[in-house]
């Protein structure tokens, strides 16, 4: 079957359906990894940072592909199955995947959450509120993909999974009766077109500070990538925007092009705030209430209060009543790896995902606010093969707000672990702190946690930061199974604590 084939509509080249609907083609599934291709699959060749799917067309054919989707100019005359040339295979992958699953998002209320920090927490708070209102929900976050209480596997560790997985998850959620789905929308996922097959009813913007600049190149490109979520809001949908966040006006401008109803929020919306180690109590004026009402949350910190306000405004936009909102916030279960308290005696041990300068500063400031007398001992590192500016930022943050620091492996990947720790350490010493007195470098994460417990006194706080919920550490030799929470519990048990 060689020759030129008219590009079917589902590749995204044509505005209207024409000859071939992928749902009625003999395709078994859509694949972008040639190793996963089986008989009857369509293989979409993607050019990535480290490999090019066009180099594996032969493998895809050998494994049973019935058609190939390639970038323009990449058609192979020696391959005998249909090949479709497109302008951008990543864009086409998203559209093919949505078509293959029969556009599951069309039957769902899709809610997208973007921002540098707070995406997962905001998603979990909103999900708790929706469930309290009796809705069947799905959620796709950094932490997990979940339908009700059923957790789906995400072996990639990508927050925004590739479009075939996203569309497959949406189809499964729709088939299991979900009405609302919350999706974390990362800058990389948006820029890489993974969410192109989704039309959102509501978008949330939490905040924005520099991050992922190794991928985006500069802050302008990073902001533009984040704002792509609001381009995907349905005409006349809803946009929830943190008006106090830098760059918020850009997101509002994009939302206006979709004629979205914009709801703004900021910390000033919460009054009579009382914060303690066990949670936060504040008052809030709902749109349908004349007098402010008291809300109880088991989360602490101004950043979590902002996340809560985002979820409240989103709930109001979705028509959820204030009683369900209050109860959903109050009944929110522990979010894995987000200010997760492992132990309170004789010292407090907390695991948190904070891995940016702003995130670390926020959590340490919060811990100081609820217990200014306690020493803050921090176990932290930085990821390899990622934005190296993070290392300087992490060093600045802990130098300013911690009392003692153990620098350790996070995900070194192909980099020398000690080199990463040296770069963080250089930032700390530049701030006037001395190695040995203020910080130590212990690459092995278990040993670093053990050392933190050795130096901790009664009443201190040990913060194990950077990995949170994650279940592996990535090294050059490959990933190893890991859990900060489990490791902390095991070491505490060794100490007979």
Enumerate the predicted regions with their spans.
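N-terminal leader/targeting and accessory segments in enzymes
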Residues: 1-95, 99, 238-239, 246, ...
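ATP-dependent carboxylate-amine ligase
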Residues: 1-18, 37-42, 48, 52, ...
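Phosphate-binding loop of NTP-binding sites
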Residues: 8, 91-243, 249-257, 309, ...
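Acidic, Mg2+-coordinating active-site environments of NTP-dependent enzymes
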Residues: 12, 74-80, 176, 200-349, ...
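Short gly/ser/thr-rich secondary-structure transition/capping motifs
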Residues: 20-30, 93-96, 161-164, 183-189, ...
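Receiver (REC) domain switch/active-site residues of two-component response regulators
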Residues: 66, 201, 403
């Amino acid at each position: 079957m060689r020759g030129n084939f008219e590009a079917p509509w589902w590749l995204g080249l044509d505005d209207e359906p024409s000859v071939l609907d992928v749902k009625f083609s003999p395709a078994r599934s859509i694949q972008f990894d040639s190793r996963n291709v089986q008989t009857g699959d369509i293989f979409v060749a993607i050019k990535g940072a480290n490999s090019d799917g066009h180099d594996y067309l032969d493998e895809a054919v050998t494994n049973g592909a019935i058609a190939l989707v390639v970038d323009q100019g990449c058609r192979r005359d020696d391959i005998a199955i249909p090949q479709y040339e497109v302008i951008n295979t990543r864009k086409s992958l998203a559209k093919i995947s949505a078509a293959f699953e029969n556009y599951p998002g069309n039957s769902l209320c899709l809610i997208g959450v973007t921002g540098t920090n707070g995406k997962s927490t905001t998603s979990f708070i909103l999900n708790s509120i929706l469930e309290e209102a009796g809705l069947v929900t799905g959620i796709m976050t950094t932490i997990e993909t979940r339908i009700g209480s059923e957790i789906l596997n995400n072996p990639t560790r990508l927050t925004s999974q590739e479009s075939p997985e996203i569309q497959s998850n949406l189809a499964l959620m729709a088939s299991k009766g979900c009405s609302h789905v919350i999706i974390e929308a990362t800058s990389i996922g948006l820029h890489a077109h993974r969410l192109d097959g989704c039309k959102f009813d509501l978008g949330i913007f939490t905040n924005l500070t520099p991050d992922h600049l190794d991928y985006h190149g500069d802050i302008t490109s990073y902001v533009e990538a984040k704002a792509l979520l609001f381009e995907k809001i349905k005409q006349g949908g809803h946009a929830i925007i943190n008006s106090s966040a830098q760059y918020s006006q850009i997101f509002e401008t994009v939302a206006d092009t979709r004629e979205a109803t914009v709801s703004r929020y900021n910390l000033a919306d919460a009054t009579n705030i009382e914060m303690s180690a066990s949670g936060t109590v504040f008052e809030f004026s709902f749109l349908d209430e004349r007098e402010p009402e008291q809300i109880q949350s088991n989360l602490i910190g101004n950043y979590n209060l902002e996340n809560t306000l985002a979820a409240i405004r989103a709930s109001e936009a979705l028509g959820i009543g204030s009683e369900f909102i209050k109860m959903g916030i109050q009944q929110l279960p522990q979010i894995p790896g987000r200010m997760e308290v492992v132990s309170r005696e004789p010292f407090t041990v907390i695991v948190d995902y904070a891995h940016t300068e702003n995130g670390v500063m926020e959590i340490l400031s919060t811990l100081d606010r609820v217990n200014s007398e306690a020493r803050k001992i921090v176990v932290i590192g930085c990821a390899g093969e990622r934005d190296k500016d993070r290392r300087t930022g992490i060093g600045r943050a802990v130098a300013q707000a911690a009392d003692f620091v153990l620098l350790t492996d996070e995900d070194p990947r192909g980099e020398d672990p000690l080199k990463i720790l040296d770069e963080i350490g250089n930032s700390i010493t530049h701030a006037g702190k001395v190695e040995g007195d203020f910080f130590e470098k212990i690459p092995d994460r278990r040993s670093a946690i053990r050392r933190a417990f050795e130096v901790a006194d009664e009443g201190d706080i040990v913060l194990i930061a950077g990995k949170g919920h994650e279940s592996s550490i990535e090294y050059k030799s490959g990933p190893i199974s890991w859990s900060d929470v489990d490791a902390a519990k095991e070491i505490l048990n060794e100490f007979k604590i």
